[in-house]
């Protein structure tokens, strides 16, 4: 049916108060959950056949950088691949890709960001529940097993890629592919 703005505001306020009331009532259980959350996540990661995810694109290094930057803001460890690899129909180079190992305290967040969810038990969900993070960035990615995993150098601070004009100044025109996130700035 029709949802009015006052109804949605009232609904959000009621939900907020209900959440506060519930958190007070479940204080001990919530504290226990908090204490076990990260140790249990590491245990889950150890049992997961997916040992890492790799993502990146030599055609769009800026978007690759921005995704890496978001992951680092969430205390997710990143590495360069130990060697270039082909997986899931894409080639991931040591210069233009990142590897995200699953064996870290942010395992559950990593899993949620990289999993491909295509079916839902409930027909009501926010649109972001369907976003696979690399696909939302239009970046190729792949799951890696222990056999495929090869970690290179750890990346503390991803570096923003620098573009350049190749071939010198032209008197007539420039020809380039509009692949990168900032390619429109050259137009």
Q: Which role does the model predict for each range below?
A:
Residues 1-187:
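Intrinsic-disorder/low-complexity accessory segments
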